[in-house]
């Protein structure tokens, strides 16, 4: 039987030092858990949490795009690393937050890091959040964005024909 105690991530020396500092700050936060807050209070707390740590944003070209697919209108934020052309590898990014929390500003650093480190274009899906949007709106928008991106990969990828 293994009797070793798990190491708390905020104290684990194998966890990157900035991440440990962030986790320690998170663990020391006072107040009720997010799930006990109203949607507005939870969103405000999430924004405050994300903006409480300093952020070095990798340079990127940012484009906001609204697309129509399968009868739905979906807002996208396209993050292209500097030097990356329009045609090329791309990935879709669906943020977490239980379809209620999060948006591009609260995920921008992470999305830019992924795009910069991979050299790929990120297509951030700004799906409608609950409770304002009823189930399954966000899932349908995510699927429509996926189909839009997939259809774009079949295009000629010339001129303005970019997914």
Positions of the model-derived regions?
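A glycine/proline-hinged amphipathic helix-loop "lid/cap" segment
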Residues: 1-81
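Short helix-loop-beta connector
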Residues: 85-86, 157-159
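Short beta-strand element of the alpha/beta-hydrolase
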Residues: 87-97
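Short amphipathic alpha-helix adjacent to the substrate-entry channel of hydrolases
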Residues: 105-125, 140
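Short beta-to-alpha linker loops that shape the active-site pocket of alpha/beta-hydrolase fold enzymes
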Residues: 126-130
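Alpha/beta-hydrolase active-site loop
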Residues: 133-155, 161-163
């Amino acid at each position: 039987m293994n009797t070793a105690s798990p190491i708390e991530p905020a104290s684990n020396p194998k966890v990157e030092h900035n991440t440990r500092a962030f986790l320690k700050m998170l663990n020391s936060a006072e107040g009720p858990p997010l799930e006990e807050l109203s949607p507005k209070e939870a969103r405000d707390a999430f924004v405050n949490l994300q903006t409480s740590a300093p952020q070095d944003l990798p340079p990127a070209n940012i484009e906001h795009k609204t697309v129509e697919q399968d009868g739905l209108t979906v807002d996208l934020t396209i993050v292209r690393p500097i030097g990356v052309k329009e045609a090329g590898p791309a990935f879709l990014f669906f943020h977490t937050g239980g379809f209620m929390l999060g948006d591009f500003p609260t995920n921008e650093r992470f999305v830019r890091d992924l795009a910069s480190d991979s050299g790929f274009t990120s297509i951030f899906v700004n799906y409608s959040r609950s409770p304002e949007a009823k189930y399954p709106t966000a899932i349908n928008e995510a699927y429509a964005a996926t189909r839009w991106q997939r259809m774009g990969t079949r295009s000629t990828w010339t001129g303005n024909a970019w997914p």
